[in-house]
Amino acid sequence: MAANLIEDNCINLVKMKFVNNTLYFKAESDEGLESDYFGKLEPKLSIIRNLNDQVLFVNEGNQPVFEDMPDSDCTDNAPHTIFIIYMYKDSLTRGLAVTISVKYKTMSTLSCKNKTISFQKMSPPDSINDEGNDIIFFQRSVPGHDDKIQFESSLYKGHFLACKKENDLFKLILKDKDENGDKSIMFTVQNKS
């Protein structure tokens, strides 16, 4: 039994050129080519916890910290604990592209600009025409852990959202993944209906 050929999904190249140690190709036709971009899809309302079961909470200073909190307190503090995770269609296949926002008085979106984690007063845009952006993270399952998630920065490859204890606070930070099984970069995401 012969396999059926799938629709021709190839690009015919007609020219190659080296410029500053980068090889460029010229396609016979631009038809069907897309630019790299992220396009916003439907959001999910979620509670994010670290592996110590502490809840991600946006404090009055608009800073993301983890706190011990029973489920009833999560409901009572919903504007600070319920995150709006917008999923984005990604023109490349690198994981589920997401933004993480919270709406308390105004909409704020998580940013890792200059490798510093903060909430910026902004709504996530409908589309982002970049390959990497400070507000886009790739949400991925953790191999060997069915219910664990990690968030990799699209702007800083190999850098992940993580929980770190500083003084008496557990803060959300961006860190370079330094070892296999690093539990500080693992989270559980509980979607609300």
From Swiss-Prot:
Keywords, comma-separated and alphabetical: Cytokine, Cytoplasm, Inflammatory response, Secreted
PTM entry text: The pro-IL-18 precursor is processed by CASP1, CASP4 or CASP5 to yield its mature, active form. The pro-IL-18 precursor features autoinhibitory interactions between the propeptide and the post-cleavage-site region, preventing recognition by the IL18R1 receptor. Processing by CASP1, CASP4 or CASP5 induces conformational changes to generate critical receptor-binding sites. The mature form is then secreted and released in the extracellular milieu by passing through the gasdermin-D (GSDMD) pore. In contrast, cleavage by CASP3 inactivates IL18.
Native species: Canis lupus familiaris (Dog)
Family note: Belongs to the IL-1 family.
Name of this protein: Interleukin-18
Ranges in a coiled coil: none
Subcellular location: Cytoplasm, Cytosol; Secreted
GO molecular function, one term: cytokine activity
Pfam family, one: IL1
GO biological process, one term: cytokine-mediated signaling pathway
Assembly and oligomerization: Forms a ternary complex with ligand-binding receptor subunit IL18R1 and signaling receptor subunit IL18RAP at the plasma membrane. Mature IL18 first binds to IL18R1 forming a low affinity binary complex, which then interacts with IL18RAP to form a high affinity ternary complex that signals inside the cell. Interacts with cargo receptor TMED10; the interaction mediates the translocation from the cytoplasm into the ERGIC (endoplasmic reticulum-Golgi intermediate compartment) and thereby secretion.
Gene3D superfamilies the UniProt entry points to: 2.80.10.50
UniProt KW Calcium keyword: no
Propeptide: 1-36
Free-text function comment from the UniProt entry: Pro-inflammatory cytokine primarily involved in epithelial barrier repair, polarized T-helper 1 (Th1) cell and natural killer (NK) cell immune responses. Upon binding to IL18R1 and IL18RAP, forms a signaling ternary complex which activates NF-kappa-B, triggering synthesis of inflammatory mediators. Synergizes with IL12/interleukin-12 to induce IFNG synthesis from T-helper 1 (Th1) cells and natural killer (NK) cells.
CDD domains xrefs: beta-trefoil_IL18 (cd23298)
